[in-house]
């Protein structure tokens, strides 16, 4: 057969192998239309260490400890190390491989086989020493796309590790603020209890003096019982929150006693350009997007499998049946073996693999959009809750101011002998009740502010670095 016929035959086989190749794989575009109708503000994005604005060194130490010792952080760091190792493997697969092989075999050749006597029926030593070289040519980008997919998984795991650290910080801050508010509520309930006891004693004196009927004591005593129950419930809730905090920071309960102090103020507001910027400010969105890109790269790997695989193998060394002449020049052997693999009759399996990769890409894109909708919902929910708490506290401030003015007039009337102590005690109890209600809405406001910070990403921002070492990233995240 002439040379040109060989070329025609080779071209025909090549085209046959590629005839069933699929179309191009496109990475789904970022869809930010659902963020366009988010309300805009004039604030800034949270800083990386937003909890430092609380000016509480003890709280900051607890956050660092929780991020360092939380099992979830260790799991996320291990997954990042696993992904980093996978990217190193994908990178290594793109290079050539060189191996040195050596073997010595003592063998008796059969006298009745293809080697006749006098060699047949005798023992001989077979020595082999060779350097082997192998390289796969990446003409269709299969290895490149596999590396990109592995790097995409590294990015996703990196974002998840950073997001886990931010999530733990938000949990510790929320628990700590709830403890602070609850401690103030307990102090307030104890003061109300003293007022209620004074009111009961006054009522008992009036009943004893015949100024009031005996049945008027029942409501006062009932109010005192309810107040005592509320105090016990608040103390039990405080103990439970302390246990929750212990689970995060891994310290003895004796070291977690929260002393009353002025409550901090978080003034996180909605930033400007909220819509599109939100995509780069949340770790879960960044991780989901990285997985979409990785899935697209894996689909391209499956697509490249439809094309011929070209590789080159070479070897050089010594081979001899006599060990005494093993490394003689006459025992040298070498060779070059270019090879091509044409997937002509494998289209069914390749197509199934490609369809599976495409389905994984669709699933990853749907998961990304689901995370995006959840992020939008969390931002809106935090806005509504913060606004509702602020409105409630504003109304309570008006009611408390009115009650305080009325209380001042009652005290003046009492000093002038125009009123008794019962009216003053009732007013003080009313003021205490309003303050307690304000404490409740203060807690809701603080938790809504923390939720707002968390919904806005907790200080996370996408970096341009495509990959980083797992262990280095683990140490960096733990040191935050």
Predicted regions and their residues:
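Terminal intrinsically disordered/low-complexity segments used for targeting and assembly
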Residues: 2-68, 151, 235-280, 322, ...
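Small/polar-residue-enriched beta-strand and adjacent coil segments characteristic
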Residues: 49, 55, 62, 77, ...
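Hydrophobic membrane-targeting signal helices
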Residues: 14-17, 195, 340-341
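Membrane-embedded segments
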Residues: 78, 82-85
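Periplasmic alpha-helical coiled-coil/stalk elements that build and connect Gram-negative outer-membrane
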Residues: 143, 152, 159-274, 385, ...
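Hydrophobic, well-ordered secondary-structure elements that form the walls
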Residues: 312, 340, 357, 364, ...
